[in-house]
Amino acid sequence: MDSDFGIPRELSPLQQLRSQYHPELPPCLQGTTVRVELGDGTTVAKAGDAHIIARAFPHTLGQPLAHFLRATAKVADAQIITEHPVKRVGIVFCGRQAPGGHNVVWGLYEALKVHNAKNTLLGFLGGSEGLFAQKTLEITDEVLQTYKNQGGYDMLGRTKDQIRTTEQVNAALKACTDLKLDSLVIIGGVTSNTDAAHLAEFFAEAKCSTKVVGVPVTINGDLKNQFVEANVGFDTTCKVNSQLISNICTDALSAEKYYYFVRLMGRKHSHVALECTLQSHPNMVILGEEVTASKLTIFDIIKQICDAVQARAEQDKNHGVILIPEGLVESIPELYALLKEIHGLLKEGVQVDNISTQLSSWSSALFEFLPPFIKKQLLLHPESDDSAQLSQIETEKLLAYLVETEMNKRLKEGTYKGKKFNAICHFFGYQARGSLPSKFDCDYAYVLGHVCYHILAAGLNGYMATVTNLKSPVNKWKCGAAPISAMMTVKRWSQNSGSTTIGRPVIHPASVDLKGKAYDLLRQNAQKFLMEDMYRNPGPVQYDGPGADAKAVSLCVEDQDYMGKIKKLQEYLDQVRTIVKPGCSQDVLKAALSVMASVTDVLTTISSSSTSGQQFA
């Protein structure tokens, strides 16, 4: 065992108090007897991707949804799992840390021990590298004692490397075989759960008995689809960020002479930025999805900000707070094109010092226009998954620099008559992702850990643990599991030659829905936020009393219970089968045929339109 992992922490009084909190379980998971109902087989979201995904997942595509129900539930096809033989389970943190991750381990450990005291849970030390090297720590009550309801991943450590290459996949197979694991639980975001799906398929093909289960844990909030409502860590991250942002808003209003540019960690998409805006009400937020949809250039964005600064100055307001998602650089078309060209040259082995001379004329002109600090950051080698090192690219400083340049120009020309523009820049991310998890994240992660046990007890492979109806109290949460392959989509790239390159099936990160209720709420208030300084301070994360049960605004305003609606549809179909049987009247039969024909026509049309909208990059 690595002595750096699993050692008892020294806890502050608040940490000690939090370690004593025991999360609640929804009724369906209480007790030792749980029913599992396997529904209809799943399909993929885009019909046009089906044949590609089917080739990649011959063993794990089309598996049914699983619903976990209380023992007393009267569902004809739901089975009670009565046998609980001894299990050996491995668990690994993949990807970046998110508040609440430790509670997934705790929940799984408790479920294992409740159902059979001889069960064993092994934590892999150092993430996927520990998996490949078979470095493990047996999870015990003593190990867990100072990590319950605590932030970080320091109990086991983590890695951001994938489980993707032939060598890595074979190492994972060997580890699970050598350690005689019945199940491997992978904790992470879109990339880690994509790897979990491919690993589950590889294990099935290799006739390995180890079942692979994924858990949606990421601060980015971008592992969202019809099965997954929220990610562990997102709630805490947004609450911590929102407190910091609101403190800055108060400072801006007090001094009345600074514009704060705040970049927020969250990868390519803007879920964190949107949620923090809804919680703290800064003056502006630049969402990457808006930039992409409107094809805004860097100069369009600068003009938007400068016009806002000028309009506020006309009301004698020379201060403000502007939020920027860290992925904005990948949403600005000319910067993204430059970044891809640089990454292509780095991949070809071109030395960093020679990159600027190898760029196309258009990219070279843009590169030379940029300030030196941004040039240096754009030249950084990409991450192990080929994505840009977004946390290292100081987009907020680039925007502040260009806005200041433009405002000085306007001041000199006499078109701007306000005070001299002063900018202060911040980057929030690391401050939040190691925070003590919120009550919601503690509960959610702990419940997901329990769900993982029931997935493996049901013998399911290639599934993700899911909990729905999350905006309601815990006693109304619905627990289940969905095949990860059903969450896959395929991207297509149009080449200059007119041909199309097709990517591998993956879980693509969800973008902010510009037709969704959360975004609509922002748009309704954007002008007031901009001009009226409606700053809101939610305060620190609350663990008890008023505010402790508060949840993300974006979670509460959306209507997301997809799996609940699937069950409701199944109930309607069952009722139709009960009513329309041989021997029913002609009138009943005619009405059923007419209605079903109309419904089928409508669904076929909708399905065809969604298929034609394939993802191109």
Swiss-Prot record:
It is found in: Cytoplasm. Pfam families: PFK (PF00365). GO terms for cellular component: mitochondrion. Its main location: cytoplasm. Expressed in roots and specific parts such as the trichomes of leaves, cotyledon veins, as well as in stamen and gynoecium of flowers. Pathway: Carbohydrate degradation; glycolysis; D-glyceraldehyde 3-phosphate and glycerone phosphate from D-glucose: step 3/4. GO terms for molecular function: 6-phosphofructokinase activity; ATP binding; diphosphate-fructose-6-phosphate 1-phosphotransferase activity; metal ion binding. One of its GO terms (biological process) is photosynthesis. The keyword GTP-binding does not apply. It comes from the Eukaryota. Keywords: Allosteric enzyme, Cytoplasm, Glycolysis, Kinase, Magnesium, Metal-binding, Transferase. Allosterically activated by fructose 2,6-bisphosphate. Belongs to the phosphofructokinase type A (PFKA) family. PPi-dependent PFK group II subfamily. Clade 'Long' sub-subfamily. PANTHER family: PYROPHOSPHATE--FRUCTOSE 6-PHOSPHATE 1-PHOSPHOTRANSFERASE (PTHR43650), PYROPHOSPHATE--FRUCTOSE 6-PHOSPHATE 1-PHOSPHOTRANSFERASE SUBUNIT ALPHA 2 (PTHR43650:SF23). Tetramer of two alpha (regulatory) and two beta (catalytic) chains. Regulatory subunit of pyrophosphate--fructose 6-phosphate 1-phosphotransferase. HAMAP family: Phosphofructokinase_II_Long (MF_01980). This is Pyrophosphate--fructose 6-phosphate 1-phosphotransferase subunit alpha 2. It comes from Arabidopsis thaliana (Mouse-ear cress). The lineage of its organism: Eukaryota, Viridiplantae, Streptophyta, Embryophyta, Tracheophyta.
